[in-house]
């Protein structure tokens, strides 16, 4: 499929004026980013998770090093010190695959201040949560889920998929 982006990004201000986002929630989210709180944005397909993540990234200080990890590049960060990493599928012989889990592990060696995972979808969520809890405060990701309970259930399932015996 082909993902088309708007010629002009949808900003928090636009979301507030359209009634999609309450002004108080927008202010809270900005303070959460500036306060380096870890965030997981959840919602259904087409709900605007990536749009919200792009908006949140606008409030990351320009002095911070940010690593983005995605299956397909969709995040459009404006900071000067951004390293964008993308998954790579296996070749015709089934070799050379680089998945999000590999990228997350390697990103930790790049000394990021924050890590943004475009979409958490499998066993890599365990590495993401460990990174969030070991000094990479302010990291963010998205997750397909219909509500808060579903998001927590999906996180639990993805951790189980990691293959790590907890």
Per-range role (PLM):
Residues 1-35:
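P-loop NTP-binding catalytic core
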Residues 26-45, 55-166:
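Switch/coupling sub-region of P-loop NTPases
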Residues 49:
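Conserved lysine of the Walker
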